[in-house]
Regions:
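Beta-strand-loop-alpha-helix segment that lines the small-molecule cofactor/substrate pocket
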Residues: 122-123, 127-175, 189, 394
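C-terminal helical cap and adjacent loop that interface with cofactors, partners, or active-site loops
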Residues: 16-24, 33, 37, 61, ...
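Basic phosphate/pyrophosphate-binding loop/patch that engages nucleotide-derived ligands
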Residues: 159-164, 181-194, 213-215
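N-terminal Rossmann-like dinucleotide-binding module
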Residues: 17-95, 173-176, 268
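Core domains of carbohydrate- and sulfate-ester-processing enzymes
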Residues: 198-243, 416-418
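Rossmann-like dinucleotide-binding domain that binds NAD(P)(H)
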Residues: 222-301
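N-terminal Rossmann-like NAD(P) cofactor-binding module of classical short-chain dehydrogenase/reductase
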Residues: 117-118
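N-terminal secretory signal peptides and thylakoid transit peptides that target proteins
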Residues: 2-22
Length: 428
């Protein structure tokens, strides 16, 4: 898009004709870097041209990072709400960055000069935009949870492999030294056999049927809903604050299982060495008097949501000790000397990342997998989604992590994906 026409294009798309303006294609739409006169891979000293789709609350940190880092050049911003988009554009301008504005992610993803895309939308858009970016030759940083459904996760994993793309999932606790140290101690047996793990997630308000309100002229509400069923507009439904908003609805998010579970369950997977597998049983709170939601692994550990975490985000309990870890510099061990223990040469040492976004940038340049790649993100999101399926059904769900199928439960199996409105199928 010509930068001088950016506002005109955006307003035209907001006013109408959006569904027919651009159709998903089944073929890659990008020109290779070689055709464009650029090397096949981005050089170690080259700037990465970035587009950001979704410019609300969660995007603010990513946008600020990309606008100020020498390694990245923001060339395009996208949002279905022109108020949010205008504010993001003003932020870029204030930092001396000139970029183009889009109301439709498909236009941004089709640009041949963009190398990588941040996907920081509500969860129900993660898969479609990420896959579209990948088939257009872009690497992707997608916020957690990676997808809204299990089948979307499989599709994203397949797309990354098919198109040879780098995907980093925003479960950034893997780039935190305290969480890595806790995971290494557990993985190497320093607290013995782990029987119980407690993860503190908290609760959102229950989903609510809000009264219908007029749709603001600045918002393309149909596109905000995207693949989900039509619902009357209410500002409380679409708001992106951490107190609930769209996150409290199953249609758009995974509630607290996907909000905080995507962080804490991810660290549990890492600590147990289960990045390519997962739990086998999911039990909801309230089933046969259960006080807490939990899931279990075939080899024994039980992961309890919101039990006694002793003030930590994650509490690992073994037969020889305990570890309490959180983001607020909380790192406590029993026995206490584990806190300063140095791993032995024969111990398994985990991937070290000092910064989640820099790790992604490095992976783009080296073409090596980042710390939380698409396969890891899919397995963690699967835990979030299966926990939600069990919660909604009010009964346990059994899972085969090898075949990635729900066992002997046709009703639960149908919930591995959601129906999509006809004009919003996955672009695969």
């Amino acid at each position: 898009m010509n930068p001088t026409n950016q506002n005109l294009s955006r307003r035209k798309l907001l006013k109408g004709g959006l569904a027919s303006a651009i159709a998903w294609s089944t073929a890659p739409l990008f020109l290779s870097p070689r055709v464009l006169g650029r090397p096949g891979n981005i050089g170690p000293n080259s700037r990465i041209n970035v587009g950001i789709v979704g410019n609300g609350l969660i995007s603010k940190g990513h946008r600020g990072f990309c606008l100020t880092q020498p390694a990245t050049q923001v060339v395009a911003l996208c949002d279905v709400d022109s108020v949010i988009l205008d504010a993001a554009m003003a932020e870029a301008k204030a930092k001396g960055v000139t970029c183009d504005a889009y109301a439709d992610s498909r236009e941004l993803c089709a640009r041949p000069d963009i190398d990588a895309v941040f996907v920081t939308t509500p969860d129900h858009w993660h898969a479609a935009i990420s896959i579209d970016a990948m088939r257009n030759g872009k690497d992707v940083y997608v916020e957690k949870p990676m997808t809204l459904t299990i089948e979307e996760g499989k599709a994203m994993r397949s797309a990354a492999e098919r198109y040879g793309r780098i995907v980093q999932v925003g479960s950034q606790q893997r780039s935190n030294g305290s969480f890595r140290k806790a995971a290494e101690l557990v993985l190497n047996g320093y607290i013995g056999k782990v029987d119980t793990i407690v993860c503190r997630l908290g609760e959102f308000p229950a989903p609510t049927q809000f009264a219908e309100e007029p749709v603001p002229a600045t918002l393309d509400y149909d596109r905000w809903l995207g693949p989900t069923p039509w619902e009357p507009f209410n500002a409380a439904r679409v708001k992106g604050d951490y107190g609930g908003g769209w996150r409290r609805f199953w249609e758009y998010g995974s509630r607290k299982n996907g909000d905080w579970g995507a962080h804490h369950f991810d660290i549990v997977q890492w600590a147990l060495g289960m990045d390519d597998s997962g739990p086998t049983l999911f039990v909801p709170k309230g089933y046969e008097g259960e006080k807490f939601q939990y899931h279990t692994y075939a080899n024994g550990p039980k992961v309890i949501r919101d039990g006694d975490s002793k003030g930590a985000m994650i509490r690992f309990i073994g037969d020889k000790g305990e570890i309490l870890v959180g983001r607020d510099d909380k790192f406590e061990t029993t026995p206490s000397n584990l806190k300063s223990l140095v791993l032995k040469s024969g111990d398994q040492q985990l991937y070290v990342s000092r910064d989640h976004r820099f790790d992604w940038i490095g992976a783009i340049k080296t073409r090596q997998q980042p710390i939380c790649h698409v396969g890891i993100g899919h397995r963690t999101a699967t835990i979030c989604q299966l926990s939600g399926i069990a919660e909604r059904l009010g009964r346990p769900v059994k899972w085969d992590p090898a075949t990635e199928q729900i066992i002997d439960d046709p009703v639960a199996s149908l919930m591995m994906d959601n129906p999509r409105r006809a004009s919003y199928s996955l672009p695969i």
